[in-house]
């Protein structure tokens, strides 16, 4: 089970976008994430009329390493760490380390 999953709200703790918040769009291999509105790059897109893609300079999100983000805790309104807890019924859930509340998935 991963500590950061798709649709989690994260806050950037290192890099040029430090302090910005965004939602995880995709989790890639090698502990990399694509977060909406974070780590924006300009890609020079070649036109492809067969696919209906116009050419030009397109702005899109690039991957960011998971160590540079932390999950956002809405209760404390701060970055937080994530741990795991096994409930009585045997389910494993993610919990915030600061207050022990379950992470909303």
Swiss-Prot record:
Keywords: Ribonucleoprotein, Ribosomal protein, RNA-binding, rRNA-binding. PROSITE patterns: RIBOSOMAL_L24 (PS01108). CDD domains: KOW_RPL26 (cd06089). GO terms for molecular function: rRNA binding; structural constituent of ribosome. SMART domains: KOW. GO terms for cellular component: ribonucleoprotein complex; ribosome. InterPro entries: KOW, Rib_uL2_dom2, Ribosomal_uL24, Ribosomal_uL24_CS, Ribosomal_uL24_KOW, Translation_prot_SH3-like_sf. GO terms for biological process: translation. Pfam families: KOW, ribosomal_L24. Belongs to the universal ribosomal protein uL24 family. Part of the 50S ribosomal subunit. One of two assembly initiator proteins, it binds directly to the 5'-end of the 23S rRNA, where it nucleates assembly of the 50S subunit. One of the proteins that surrounds the polypeptide exit tunnel on the outside of the subunit. This is Large ribosomal subunit protein uL24.
């Amino acid at each position: 089970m991963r500590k950061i999953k798709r649709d989690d709200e994260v806050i950037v703790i290192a890099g040029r976008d430090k302090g910005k918040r965004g939602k995880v769009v995709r989790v890639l291999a090698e502990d990399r994430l694509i977060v909406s509105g974070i780590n924006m790059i300009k890609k020079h897109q070649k036109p492809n009329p067969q696919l209906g893609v116009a050419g030009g300079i397109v702005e899109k999100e690039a991957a960011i390493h998971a160590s540079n983000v932390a999950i956002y805790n809405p209760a404390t309104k701060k970055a937080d760490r994530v741990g795991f807890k096994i409930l009585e019924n045997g389910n494993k859930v993610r919990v915030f380390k600061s207050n022990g509340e379950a992470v909303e998935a």
